């Protein structure tokens, strides 16, 4: 019922047909199976057999940010923006929050803007969550997407196991139930907006609606928040938590602005590189 309601919202808000939404949400192989159903399907993904690693403890700064996030959720700020500088350890905070949701019997949806980021995170998260991790994105084969889709829609499995579904934009359309938390990492990234074909939806906005339908919490993470999210946070519509210290106390790099127009006029360029940049590289 909630999945149909979400599809209906996407159809109305983004002005497309419900059929276009369903086409984007359902694995392509499901249509083929209706026409020519195979006699037997085998599991495509081997179960994880590697070691399960413990979750690393947070630094005092990270722990303070995590506590602030949970305090805001307790104060009915269901959407929180985590404004953390680059390399501040936002992912570590995500992992702790994910584990808390799994311990509470809830599922978690973890959205990243690029499929490449999904690949990088998978190995790290799988060492912690094992077979509870489900990866879903558009570069999977039809058979792989169907397998994961069925794993998510298997209600008996959902009852006995809680999942962390990590994926790019299309993962927000999955029929995951019993969601306790939706994480939208790098929430400012334009890749969350579908351009072609329809439905031309924004995964961040869709995730917020999905969370409202399931009474789940939302955590938006970014070092450079989008204008709209930061505005809502400043106005108090969203909760705001700032993580301004890089993990391990590493200082932020110094930034120098170079006027390339002046560099060209002064002939202080080496091919396409300014002389100050070349000097710093040589150092």
Indicate where each model-derived feature is located.
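Accessory, non-ATPase domains that flank or precede helicase/AAA+ motor cores in DNA-metabolism machines
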Residues: 1-222, 229, 234-250, 283
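Conserved interdomain hinge at the start of the Helicase C-terminal
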Residues: 75, 95-101, 258-283
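Generic structural signal for residues in well-ordered beta-strands
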Residues: 133, 255-257
């Amino acid at each position: 019922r909630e999945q149909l309601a979400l599809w209906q919202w996407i159809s109305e808000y983004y002005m497309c047909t419900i059929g276009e939404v369903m086409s984007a949400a359902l694995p392509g192989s499901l249509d083929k199976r209706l026409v020519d159903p195979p006699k037997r399907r085998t599991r495509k993904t081997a179960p994880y057999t590697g070691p399960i690693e413990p979750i690393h403890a947070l630094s005092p700064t990270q722990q303070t940010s995590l506590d602030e996030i949970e305090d805001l959720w307790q104060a009915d700020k269901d959407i929180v923006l985590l404004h953390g500088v680059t390399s501040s350890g936002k992912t570590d905070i995500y992992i702790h929050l994910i584990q808390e949701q799994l311990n509470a019997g809830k599922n978690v949806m973890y959205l990243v803007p690029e499929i490449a980021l999904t690949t990088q995170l998978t190995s790290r998260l799988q060492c912690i969550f094992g077979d509870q991790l489900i990866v879903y994105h558009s570069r999977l084969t039809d058979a792989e997407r169907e397998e994961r889709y069925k794993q998510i829609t298997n209600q008996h499995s959902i009852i006995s196991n809680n999942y962390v579904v990590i994926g790019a934009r299309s993962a927000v359309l999955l029929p995951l139930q019993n969601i306790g938390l939706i994480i939208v990492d790098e929430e400012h990234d334009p890749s969350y907006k579908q351009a072609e074909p329809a439905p031309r939806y924004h995964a961040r906005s869709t995730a917020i609606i999905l969370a409202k339908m399931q009474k789940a919490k939302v955590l938006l993470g970014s070092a450079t928040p989008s204008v709209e999210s930061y505005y809502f946070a400043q106005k108090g519509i969203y909760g705001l938590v700032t993580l301004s210290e890089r993990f391990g106390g590493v200082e932020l790099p110094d930034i120098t602005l170079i006027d390339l127009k002046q560099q060209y006029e002064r002939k202080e360029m080496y091919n396409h590189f300014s002389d100050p940049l070349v000097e710093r590289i040589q150092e």
